Amino acid sequence: MDQENDRSISRLWRTFRTVKEMVRDRGYFIAQEELDLTLEDFKVKYCDSMGRAQRKMMSFQANPTEESMTKFPDMGTLWVEFCDEPSVGVKTMKTFVIHIQEKQFQTGIFIYQNNITPSAMKLVPSIPPATIETFHEAALVVNITHHDLVPKHIRLNEEEKAELLKRYRLKESQLPRIQRADPVALYLGLKRGEVVKIIRKSETAGRYASYRICM
């Protein structure tokens, strides 16, 4: 039991680190010491005296960096919540949705352990202009953007998108697509119509860029 709990805590620590990296990579301020949190320090900070994870204590707010606010003025604040309950029903999701509304967060990220009921999932798109995203803990144990085969993706703002289309005399419909369900699109929180610049390494050209629109 203790060994299984240790493995579970280790996975949760890695998920927590990936979430912090994901939030930082979206342009929110995350201090370096938060990214460098060791497993032992994680246990001290987020586990009780019995060594059990206290997920509610892991929830946090993040604000855009100055650079991000200049590029994306409507970005707003973000709230990440780790759910204590193994299975998420309507009541828990409704509480989360109300929290996002009342505190006027622009984005709410809900991290769950096992599953969310279909009825609870129906609440997810219910509070525009705020966006709610859900992630399974297991999907974030490893940061996919750190994989050697995953190129760097950079989200463009509306001005950069318009300039791109003008430069290449393109319509939106002519751009290659990236699906919203793509793991990197989910990681960056891409919305329909947003464009990403993808930088790949080339043996002949050093680096080259391509562009995809989220659909």
From Swiss-Prot:
GO biological process per UniProt: termination of RNA polymerase I transcription; termination of RNA polymerase III transcription; transcription elongation by RNA polymerase I; transcription elongation by RNA polymerase II; transcription initiation at RNA polymerase I promoter; transcription initiation at RNA polymerase II promoter; transcription initiation at RNA polymerase III promoter; tRNA transcription by RNA polymerase III
InterPro entries for this protein: Arch_Rpo5/euc_Rpb5, RNA_pol_Rpb5_N, RNA_pol_Rpb5_N_sf, RNA_pol_subH/Rpb5_C, RNA_pol_subH/Rpb5_CS, RPB5-like_sf
Subcellular location: Nucleus
PROSITE patterns named among the record's database cross-references: RNA_POL_H_23KD
Database matches in Pfam families: RNA_pol_Rpb5_C, RNA_pol_Rpb5_N
GO molecular function term, any single one: DNA-directed RNA polymerase activity
Keyword Nucleus: yes
Gene3D superfamilies documented for this protein: RNA polymerase, Rpb5, N-terminal domain, RPB5-like RNA polymerase subunit
Domain of life of the native organism: Eukaryota
Keyword Transcription recorded: yes
Keywords per UniProt: DNA-directed RNA polymerase, Nucleus, Transcription
One cellular component term from this protein's GO annotations in UniProt: RNA polymerase II, core complex
Assembly with partners or alone: Component of the RNA polymerase I (Pol I), RNA polymerase II (Pol II) and RNA polymerase III (Pol III) complexes consisting of at least 14, 12 and 17 subunits, respectively.
Similarity-based family: Belongs to the archaeal Rpo5/eukaryotic RPB5 RNA polymerase subunit family.
Role, per record: DNA-dependent RNA polymerase catalyzes the transcription of DNA into RNA using the four ribonucleoside triphosphates as substrates. Common component of RNA polymerases I, II and III which synthesize ribosomal RNA precursors, mRNA precursors and many functional non-coding RNAs, and small RNAs, such as 5S rRNA and tRNAs, respectively. Pol II is the central component of the basal RNA polymerase II transcription machinery. Pols are composed of mobile elements that move relative to each other.
Protein name: DNA-directed RNA polymerases I, II, and III subunit RPABC1
Species per Swiss-Prot/TrEMBL record: Candida glabrata (strain ATCC 2001 / BCRC 20586 / JCM 3761 / NBRC 0622 / NRRL Y-65 / CBS 138) (Yeast)
UniProt lineage: Eukaryota, Fungi, Dikarya, Ascomycota, Saccharomycotina
